[in-house]
């Protein structure tokens, strides 16, 4: 009972005590957990909204970590006691928003100010250390074994005060810097050590730093270094992400960079230590090695030692960070290194000047004052500028080496890491406008570079102009940033439209505010733009003179703004014609194309009238190219022929004008220096003219001119320096090679071009790029027929049946020009080895606007040809038959290949039978009939042939001038020699230099000399006949004038006078087929073209007793040599696009 009473008393006491404490707890709960009304009435007091008691101190609450303040009360929590902070539990405490960020900014500013103070007084510390013995020993030890640290930034010697020792000042003036960019051998995306211990990162830091020391430094003090694996690459550092978080939360690689930049940077071994300079009268130059990813022993070059009289360089390894690598453009940099390429500061500045003056005006998306400043802004942009400027070098050695290195550097910079700089997008755009070397279309990285630049620019906010702060705070700063960011974004728009048009792909860029604003504003003054690009001193003045209103930053150079307006029209054109949802190929329905294209064409003409495109040749060429694309849309399959007819003449006139404008540009520029949008315009013109000469829709008066323009483009493309032509493969060589293959198709299988109706008949899903792919298909199809006679026979039968049941009257009906199957397709004089070292292109523009090109051998080519002729033929007089395999009589050809011209220049009627050569050095050297050289008659003696020999070796430039890549008719006449290497044995004195086409004087055209294969060469041709043949080569007919004959086996009755209008005979196309020793089973193969059927056996047995080849066989060998790869069975040469792995069976 007592126990129970005691328990009951305790219960009463507990209940009474509980009752007393209950009001206090209720008050506390009401204070901490207010009612709904109280929360509504006091919603502004944020401290009243706590849903649970506060048990953590203010510091732990801010960092959201566990706190034991309630258990240790009244003592501070463990963390505050360890760090020494004031521990307080305050439920009403709330930090102000942005206060921590402001504190961080203040800390950064304070660190920068202290750092500037230390740098300004570096000589004082050196002087003090030299006063004590320990300081001298420390300096000597550190000087012998420097510790390279990432994040190294070389201070500007010009910014240091003059106070201090004279030795230190002299060292600053004399020190030189070699900056080097390293490429990793293989990407290292994952780090081996992922621990968070700071000591581990310190050890890894020391290991990776020592790994890049010179071998001599490693041998002197290797015991104190941390052991590392010899072949382990250093961890990959992000060169653009700013360590704005705590180092504990950073990835391992960035923690290492953070540790290096914040701990080692303020030590005597740090990057700002004056020890990195020289402390003795014998100055040692400093090497700054800027690395993206360092391979082991990557810095084995430029071995440096202390106090070396040769002033070698001591390495200081650095990695790119958000802080500029070279704060001042006046730093004493004397060398830039990438891989095995080393560029001195003088050469870098020269290449920089070449780029700014010769390349940047074509695509003004950036500005730069000197090479050092450009390198400090972006290494990728710097090396891209150097690469592009190397296009002007006479030798492509450096260009070829840099191209592969820069391709790898671009991949590492953009794919492995995430760049935070507009300069990266600018570098990618430059690589798009002046593409890297490539053999096939699919090998070209330009379109992928455009897409990458566009994606990066979206991330950087380039499409939103002034709202850069809403995208990232870690971008590389640049002067007048919004202006150049806007130009870069507009450059992406233009490059994407240009490459989409080249590849025949739909563009993805759309018109936005920045584009509309730039197009609506006026042109920027050229003087201001030049100041941006060239003069650094005038840059500040230009900024002060900028217009105060906002629109000044949207103003563009006149040419760039006009190019953007054309690109904007291209986007509209592609969207209207090639973005249909009602057809599987995406094209507008054929019945609506003509009307739509007519409206768009008028809009383009109005745009040209408003913006005056003709004021600039570069803009005018691109305008004409856009106009050609409008015509090309009309040539796509299923477009009615009646709707195509108006665009055929317009396409011809536009394409020939592009050829003429390109010829004018090449008077002052090299072809390889021109941007891709100009070269693409010329390429597209050549391809469309090649197609137009195959269609009956082209008027006869334009036929010769179209073919001559194709020859001109090919010769301008091939007539490059030998070193560039043999070492660099790009769009220039690819286009020239493609034209040569198409020419070979004209020889071997011309029916491939005319089996289908229409100008573009087999491709349709590549927009205007279908023209290129259609011609590529023809090359592959002809080669397949060449290798498979059975397939060729089936294809011909199938085409004949299809033609029989076709209802297209324009292509099948008889007219003044005959049906398309009755038309004779003649090969073009396209030569693939006419480099500038051996030939010079003499161009002339006729009054009708056609540019005609004539090849003239150089002095060196004639000398080599004579030496080769003596070696092969054993002639003592040094007779010359050909130069680089090209018969001299064919050098003057500008239209179709003509057989008689191979022998018309010989004075002996038995030259052919006696196997005489085509050109004899003992004879007079005259000019081609279509040359622009003045004519001077040289008296010849029939008794003494040696009396008229022209010593074109000793006379030098007076006979064979030192020409550039081309010569136009604008050159003064007195600069030309009186006699130049030509094609005929006697000078032509009665031929006018003004050779016009049949366009201006419509006359009945004669047959091509290709038709008149004369088998009786005993008749001697006079000079007048030779001249008539040359003049008629520009006005030959594509169709016979006399009635056709179903049997053309009696070719020995051909009239010997090739200028006669009675010549009605045609050579069979099998004349160009393989000889019997190559493919004997084709000797009696029949070729069917229209109603004419001939056999090749009639022309394979005309060799004489001396086994002399007929003209047909000579041309066969010549074109086989020109088209290497067809006869040998190597199909890789035909793969312009990259279709070698695709199905090329009949169903393709």
Swiss-Prot record:
One of its GO terms (molecular function) is transcription cis-regulatory region binding. It is found in: Nucleus. Residues 57-87 bind DNA. Its main location: nucleus. One of its GO terms (cellular component) is nucleus. Signal peptide: none annotated. Residues 538-550 have a biased composition (Basic and acidic residues). Keywords: DNA-binding, Metal-binding, Nucleus, Phosphoprotein, Sporulation, Transcription, Transcription regulation, Zinc. GO terms for biological process: DNA-templated transcription; regulation of DNA-templated transcription; sporulation resulting in formation of a cellular spore. Residues 1029-1050 have a biased composition (Polar residues). The keyword Transmembrane does not apply. Residues 150-169 have a biased composition (Low complexity). The modification Phosphoserine is found at residues 8, 263, 806. Residues 1-51, 148-180, 524-550, 1029-1063 are annotated as: Disordered. Disulfide bonds: none annotated. PANTHER family: FINGER DOMAIN PROTEIN, PUTATIVE-RELATED (PTHR31845), TRANSCRIPTION FACTOR SEF1-RELATED (PTHR31845:SF6). Putative transcription factor that seems to be involved in the sporulation process. Suppresses the lethal phenotype of RPM2 deletion. This is Putative transcription factor SEF1. It comes from Saccharomyces cerevisiae (strain ATCC 204508 / S288c).
């Amino acid at each position: 009972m007592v126990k129970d009473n005691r328990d009951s008393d305790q219960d009463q006491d507990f209940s009474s005590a509980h009752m007393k404490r209950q009001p206090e707890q209720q008050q506390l709960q009401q204070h901490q957990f207010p009612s709904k009304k109280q929360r509504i009435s006091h919603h502004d007091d944020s401290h009243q909204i706590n849903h649970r008691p506060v048990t953590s101190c203010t510091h732990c609450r801010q960092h959201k970590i566990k706190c034991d303040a309630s258990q240790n009360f009244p003592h501070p929590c463990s963390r505050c006691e360890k760090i020494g902070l004031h521990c307080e539990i305050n439920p009403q405490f709330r930090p102000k928003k942005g206060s921590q960020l402001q504190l961080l900014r203040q800390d950064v500013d304070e660190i920068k100010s202290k750092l500037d103070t230390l740098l300004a007084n570096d000589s004082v510390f050196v002087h003090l250390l030299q006063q004590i013995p320990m300081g001298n020993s420390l300096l000597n030890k550190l000087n012998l074994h420097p510790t390279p640290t990432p994040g190294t930034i070389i201070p500007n010697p010009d910014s240091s005060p003059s106070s201090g020792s004279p030795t230190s000042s002299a060292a600053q003036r004399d020190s030189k810097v070699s900056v080097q960019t390293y490429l990793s051998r293989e990407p290292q995306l994952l780090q081996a050590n992922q621990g968070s211990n700071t000591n581990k990162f310190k050890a890894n830091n020391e290991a990776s730093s020592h790994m890049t020391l010179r071998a001599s430094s490693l041998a002197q003090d290797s015991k104190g270094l941390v052991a590392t694996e010899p072949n382990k690459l250093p961890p990959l550092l992000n060169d653009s992400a700013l360590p704005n978080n705590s180092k504990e939360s950073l990835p391992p690689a960035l923690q290492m960079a953070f540790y290096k930049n914040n701990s080692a940077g303020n030590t005597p071994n740090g990057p700002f230590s004056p020890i990195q300079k020289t402390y003795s009268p014998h100055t040692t130059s400093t090497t700054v090695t800027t690395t993206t990813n360092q391979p082991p022993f990557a810095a084995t070059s430029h071995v440096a030692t202390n106090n070396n009289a040769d002033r070698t360089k001591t390495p200081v390894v650095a990695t790119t960070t958000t802080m500029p690598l070279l704060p001042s453009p006046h730093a004493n940099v004397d060398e830039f290194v990438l891989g095995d390429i080393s560029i001195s500061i003088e050469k870098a500045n020269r290449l920089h000047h070449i780029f700014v003056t010769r390349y940047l005006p074509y695509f003004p998306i950036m500005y730069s004052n000197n090479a050092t400043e450009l390198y400090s802004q972006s290494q990728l942009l710097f090396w891209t500028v150097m690469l592009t400027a190397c296009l002007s070098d006479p030798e492509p050695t450096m260009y070829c080496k840099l191209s592969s290195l820069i391709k790898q550097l671009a991949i590492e910079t953009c794919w492995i890491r995430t760049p935070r700089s507009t300069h990266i997008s600018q570098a990618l755009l430059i690589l798009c406008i002046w593409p890297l070397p490539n053999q096939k279309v699919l090998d070209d990285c330009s379109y992928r570079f455009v897409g990458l630049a566009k994606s990066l620019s979206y991330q950087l906010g380039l499409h939103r102009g002034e709202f850069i702060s809403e995208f990232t705070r870690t971008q590389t700063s640049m002067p007048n940033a919004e202006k150049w960011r806007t130009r870069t974004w507009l450059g992406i728009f233009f490059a994407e439209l240009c490459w989409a048009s080249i590849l025949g792909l739909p563009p993805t860029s759309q018109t936005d505010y920045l584009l509309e604003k730039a197009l609506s504003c006026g042109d920027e003054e050229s003087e201001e733009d030049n100041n941006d690009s060239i003069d650094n001193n005038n840059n500040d003045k230009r900024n002060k003179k900028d217009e105060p209103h906002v629109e000044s930053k949207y103003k563009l150079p006149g040419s760039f703004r006009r190019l953007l307006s054309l690109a904007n029209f291209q986007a509209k054109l592609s969207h209207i014609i090639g973005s249909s949802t009602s057809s599987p190929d995406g094209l507008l329905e054929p019945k609506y194309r003509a009307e739509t294209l007519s409206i768009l064409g008028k809009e383009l003409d109005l745009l040209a009238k408003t913006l005056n495109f003709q004021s600039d040749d570069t803009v005018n060429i691109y305008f004409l190219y856009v106009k050609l694309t409008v015509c090309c849309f009309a040539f796509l399959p299923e477009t009615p022929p009646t709707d195509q007819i108006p665009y055929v003449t317009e396409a011809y006139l536009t394409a020939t004008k592009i050829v003429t404008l390109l010829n004018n540009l090449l008077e002052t520029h090299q072809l390889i220096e021109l941007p891709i949008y100009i070269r693409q315009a010329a390429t597209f013109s050549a391809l469309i003219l090649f197609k137009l000469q195959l269609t009956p829709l082209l008027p006869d008066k334009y036929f010769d001119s179209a073919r001559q323009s194709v020859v001109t483009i090919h010769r301008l493309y091939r007539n490059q320096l030998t070193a560039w032509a043999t070492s660099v493969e790009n769009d220039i060589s690819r286009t020239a090679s493609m034209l040569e293959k198409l020419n070979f198709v004209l020889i071997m299988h011309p029916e491939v071009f005319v089996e289908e109706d229409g100008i573009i008949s087999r491709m349709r899903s590549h927009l205007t790029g279908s023209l290129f792919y259609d011609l590529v298909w023809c090359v592959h199809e002809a080669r397949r027929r060449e290798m498979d006679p059975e397939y060729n026979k089936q294809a011909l039968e199938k085409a004949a049946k299809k033609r029989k049941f076709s209802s297209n009257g324009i292509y099948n009906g008889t007219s003044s020009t005959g049906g398309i199957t009755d038309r004779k397709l003649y090969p073009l004089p396209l030569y693939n080895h006419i480099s500038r070292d051996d030939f010079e292109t003499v161009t002339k523009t006729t009054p009708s606007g056609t540019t005609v090109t004539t090849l003239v051998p150089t002095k060196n080519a004639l000398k080599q040809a004579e030496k080769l002729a003596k070696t092969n033929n054993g002639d003592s007089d040094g007779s010359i038959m050909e130069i680089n395999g090209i018969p001299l009589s064919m050098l003057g050809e500008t239209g179709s290949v003509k057989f008689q011209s191979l022998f018309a220049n010989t004075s002996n009627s038995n030259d052919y039978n006696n196997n005489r050569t085509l050109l004899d050095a003992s004879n007079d050297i005259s000019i081609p009939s279509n040359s622009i050289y003045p004519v001077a008659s040289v008296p010849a003696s029939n008794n003494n042939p040696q009396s008229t020999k022209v010593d074109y070796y000793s006379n030098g430039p007076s006979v064979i001038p030192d020409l550039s890549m081309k010569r136009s008719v604008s050159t003064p006449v007195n600069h030309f020699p009186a006699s130049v290497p030509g094609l005929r044995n006697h000078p032509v004195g009665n031929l006018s230099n003004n050779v016009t086409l049949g366009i201006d004087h419509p006359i009945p055209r004669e047959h091509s000399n290709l038709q008149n294969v004369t088998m009786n060469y005993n008749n001697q041709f006079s000079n007048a006949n030779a001249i008539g043949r040359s003049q008629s080569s520009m006005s030959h007919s594509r169709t016979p004038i006399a009635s056709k004959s179903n049997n053309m086996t009696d070719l020995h009755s051909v009239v010997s006078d090739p200028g006669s209008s009675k010549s009605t005979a045609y050579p069979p196309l099998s004349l160009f087929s393989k000889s019997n020793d190559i493919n004997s089973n084709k000797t009696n193969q029949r070729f069917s073209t229209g109603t004419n059927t001939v056999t090749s056996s009639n022309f394979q047995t005309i060799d004489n007793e001396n086994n002399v080849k007929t003209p047909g066989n000579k041309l066969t060998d010549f074109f086989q040599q020109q088209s290497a790869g067809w006869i040998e069975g190597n199909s890789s040469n035909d793969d312009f696009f990259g279709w070698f792995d695709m199905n090329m069976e009949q169903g393709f």
